[in-house]
Amino acid sequence: MTAADLEEVIAIESDSFPRPWTRDHFLAEIDSNRSLPLVAKNREGRIAGYICSTHVLDEGEILDVAVRRDCRGKGLGRMLVTTAISTLTARGVSSIGLEVRASNASAIALYRRIGFETVGLRKNYYENGEDAFLMAYTINDSEDRADAV
């Protein structure tokens, strides 16, 4: 992801979330050495989805992921998440966490299919009082690390 991608990224973000990230938030992720902001483009060169993840020492976190509405249900979200896992694993991460709205059944199902487990709950986490599930993915041993790359 680069600053040139932000117009399309912000449009997807605004369509996907009730409280979207701002341009400044995305710019901070682009500029951070620990962040891994990635975009996926379609054949026409339009951004179809993106993911922002970060890492500190051996812990990674998926911060934001969204797929353009007309591209959903085609495996792009899975590809973005598994690419982030592979990239974070290559950087020495042994676990990856994320927070997801309790009502976001499709995202929760996707994360579970990939191997994330629900490990906690943040009550009233979002502005509207909605809870967030805490989910985690663990890279168990060197074999898993090699497979993830």
Regions found by a protein language model. Name each.
Residues R68, R72, R101-S103:
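Residue-level recognition of the GNAT/N-acetyltransferase active site
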Residues G75:
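Glycine-rich phosphate-binding loop
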Residues A3-D70, R78-R91, G120, T138-V149:
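Acetyl-CoA-dependent GNAT
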Residues A84-L88, I96, A107:
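Short hydrophobic clusters on alpha-helical segments that form packing/core surfaces
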Residues S94, R101-A105, N124-V149:
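C-terminal "cap" of GNAT-fold acetyltransferases
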Residues L80, N104-A107:
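Conserved short alpha-helix immediately C-terminal to the canonical SAM/SAH-binding motif I
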Residues Y111, F116, M135:
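Conserved active-site tyrosine of GNAT-family acetyltransferases
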